[in-house]
């Protein structure tokens, strides 16, 4: 039986309470780790002292003054977290008691409330094969609850996925460095790998990107249940397959593993800070 929106709202309320003690747990821990050593802004240039990091040397000033100088940075007091949430058709997949959409909402809630604990701003970008909705970063519990309500009730215009679109949008609207969590199955229906690589490379030079993969176990392999009709949630394409055939099941599993490997390679190539694979289990 699928959960109702009231069920999810009840869980969100429980999550809000739970996150008060999650600072060293799974998602809150990842949040703190992602921000550790981040959010540094330029403060001043001063002469080099023994023990200073040579990577901070300002070579232009050093050349002009003929004395080693370094750039000094200070930690910014106000940090920003962005959530890039995949709202394409594939998020409505679910073979157990919950949809992928519901799990995404829970993860987003934990991350957002963790940011609130640190008095940080939280913003959100909903995307399919386009940017569906942009919620500018703000502070406060009421703002986070608004984001979660939007996640629960939002109806996208498109069912497809184009990951490069929200990443480009992030680069354009967020000039200040932030940590960004991308919540998606990372199955790009356009197959435009070069566009995604380019977008991630540019965004990664300005922001800290964290990939969180959300999937259902039944997406990885087919059960042996005879002849069934499969439908692509994003393209709407339907096909009949004989799941009693070992060859068919093996081909399906191999295809998923291949695509999963390509996703991991893309994230690694673009130096995504953390690529978490989240199986479809209860938090």
What kind of region is each of these model predictions?
Residues 1-132:
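An amphipathic, basic-hydrophobic helix/alpha-beta surface used to engage anionic
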Residues 25, 257-275:
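Subset of Sec-pathway N-terminal targeting signals
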Residues 59, 85-88, 124, 170, ...:
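DG-centered beta-turn motif at the end of beta-strands
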Residues 121-150:
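Short beta-strand-loop
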Residues 143-178, 190, 216-217:
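Von Willebrand factor
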Residues 177, 192-196, 200-233:
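Helix-loop elements that line ligand-binding/catalytic pockets
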Residues 222-261:
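SAM-dependent methyltransferase
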Residues 281-282:
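Conserved small/polar residues in nucleotide/adenosyl-binding loops
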């Amino acid at each position: 039986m699928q959960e109702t929106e009231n069920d999810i709202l009840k869980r969100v309320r429980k999550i809000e309470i739970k996150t008060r003690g999650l600072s060293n747990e799974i998602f809150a821990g990842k949040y703190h780790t992602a921000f550790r050593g981040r959010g540094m802004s330029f403060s001043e240039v001063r002469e080099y002292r023994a023990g200073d990091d040579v990577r901070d040397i300002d070579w232009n000033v050093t050349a002009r003054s003929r004395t080693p100088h370094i750039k000094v940075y200070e930690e910014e007091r106000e940090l920003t977290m962005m959530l890039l949430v995949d709202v394409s058709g594939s998020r409505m997949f679910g073979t157990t008691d919950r949809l992928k959409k519901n799990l995404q909402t829970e993860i987003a809630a934990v991350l957002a409330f963790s940011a609130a604990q640190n008095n940080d701003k939280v913003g959100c970008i909903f995307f399919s094969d386009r940017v569906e909705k942009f919620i500018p970063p703000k502070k406060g519990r009421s703002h986070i609850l608004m984001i979660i309500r939007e996640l629960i009730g939002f109806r996208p215009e498109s069912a497809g996925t184009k990951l490069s679109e929200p990443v480009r949008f992030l680069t354009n609207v967020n000039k200040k460095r932030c940590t960004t969590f991308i919540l998606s199955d990372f199955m790009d229906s356009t197959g435009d790998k070069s566009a995604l690589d380019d977008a991630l490379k540019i965004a990664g030079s300005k922001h800290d990107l964290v990939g969180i993969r959300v999937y259902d176990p039944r997406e990885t392999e087919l059960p042996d249940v005879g002849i069934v009709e499969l439908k692509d949630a994003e393209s709407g394409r339907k096909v009949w397959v004989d799941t009693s055939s070992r060859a068919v099941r093996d081909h399906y599993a191999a295809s998923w593993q291949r695509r999963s490997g390509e996703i991991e390679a893309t994230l690694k190539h673009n130096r995504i800070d953390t690529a978490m694979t989240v199986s479809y289990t209860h938090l």
